[in-house]
Amino acid sequence: MSEALTPRQIVEKLDQFIVGQKEAKKAVAIALRNRYRRSLLDEKLRDEVVPKNILMIGPTGVGKTEIARRLAKLVGAPFVKVEATKFTEVGYVGRDVESMVRDLVETSVRLVKERKMNEVKDRAEQQANKRLVELLVPGKQKQTMKNPLELLFGGAQTSQQDTYQTYEDDHIEQKRRQVAWQLANGQLEDEMVTIEVEEQQPMFFDFLQGAGIEQMGMNMQDALSSLIPKRRKKRKLKVREARKVLTNEEAQKLIDMDEVTQEAIRLAEQSGIIFIDEIDKIARSGQAASSADVSREGVQRDILPIVEGSTVMTKYGPVKTDHILFIAAGAFHMAKPSDLIPELQGRFPIRVELTKLSVDDFVKILVEPDNALIKQYKALLATEGINLEFSDDAIRKIAEVAFEVNQTTDNIGARRLHTIMEKLLEDLLFEAPDITLDEVVITPQYVEQKLGNIVKNKDLSEFIL
């Protein structure tokens, strides 16, 4: 997707996956469009225009993360989601806040590398097919002369060998042409072939993560990988699987990793989106100050320079955070946005409040999005030859149950529907392979039968739904 989408078009695209929350969609659409507008400015002014970071306020399960994730996917921007509670102050054991930028760059490198490999895929597949032909019809190894004197006294014999060798080479070449034709026509897809692949090195240093090594801006495994020789092992695969492995190897040879790295850093700096969840958990609770509050404030102060704009060292090189879009989110049940330190509040000038989901919202979530739950379950049961249908009243009943359980127990938003739908269709999903019916219709009576008693019993609701 192009970044030249208008705010209205962006909102329409988000509407395909997320129900309601117009204000939040509007805010992120404007932020994305501003990036496009900034790219059209002259270089001097472009550096001065920084993104307006967004603070989303709303309960869990109303679409905060999904809005940011879908936005990034819409324009092919690198996106990472981090939880503020996972970070610790500099000097303490745990993840330092700069790791979010390193994660973003890793994501960006992966995106760019994937795109570059897709660009050379056709050439790589041609090379892979050539290698497959050579593996399926191996050439005869030429014999080397053991004694140099044979050059002087073995002339006639050598001439005969050369003639025979030429005949053999022609025969192999002819056979390879035949195999290449069969490969091109998909006639050898199930043939077995032995290939050599790089053996995955075990991650020796995973246990050290978070113990200060991350602050070095590099992964020790990568640092030592150049010292440890890469081992190769033989694998026997079907031709169709071997082609994928060989195509991947050939594509990696065709791309320039230095170019990938430079483009990835530029993409992360100019288009990256970092979503900081649970930011309310590191705000002061408004009660008397405690050591926990001091620690939380330390994390806020560590986040501040990254959000303001600084340079973070990564294993790919220095990365500037000045133009990365930060979207922070939190429920703010126990704390208020004003409980964040003033400097950090000022770095999130756009605030949007996401509303709790109503019964009507639940109805829309069940049927409208492209990835709606009902569409998913219908597709799953269609694989068993069963046409699953829901009456409008049944959908309404499911939405009412979800809303009621959210009201009487913890409000987990749209995630409640996953639990309810799984419980509702549990027996059907279990019995599906043995059912002889072609069509099953879910009615309000069926919903009441499966969920009614559980909803009425608060204790059961807390444990089951």
UniProtKB/Swiss-Prot annotation:
Q: Single GO molecular-function term?
A: ATP binding
Instruction: Answer yes or no on keyword Disulfide bond.
Output: no
Signal sequence annotation: none
What is an annotated GO biological process for this record, any one?
protein unfolding
Q: Which UniProt keywords apply?
A: ATP-binding, Chaperone, Cytoplasm, Nucleotide-binding, Stress response
Q: What highest taxon heads this organism's lineage?
A: Bacteria
Cellular component, GO annotation: HslUV protease complex
Q: Where in the cell is it found?
A: Cytoplasm
Does the keyword ATP-binding belong to this entry? yes
Q: Which residues bind ATP?
A: V19, G61, V62, G63, K64, T65, E66, D277, E343, R415
Annotated function: ATPase subunit of a proteasome-like degradation complex; this subunit has chaperone activity. The binding of ATP and its subsequent hydrolysis by HslU are essential for unfolding of protein substrates subsequently hydrolyzed by HslV. HslU recognizes the N-terminal part of its protein substrates and unfolds these before they are guided to HslV for hydrolysis.
**Family statement drawn from the similarity comment of this UniProt entry:** Belongs to the ClpX chaperone family. HslU subfamily.
Assembly information from the UniProt record: A double ring-shaped homohexamer of HslV is capped on each side by a ring-shaped HslU homohexamer. The assembly of the HslU/HslV complex is dependent on binding of ATP.
Extract the HAMAP family matched here.
Answer: HslU (MF_00249)
Protein name stated in the entry: ATP-dependent protease ATPase subunit HslU
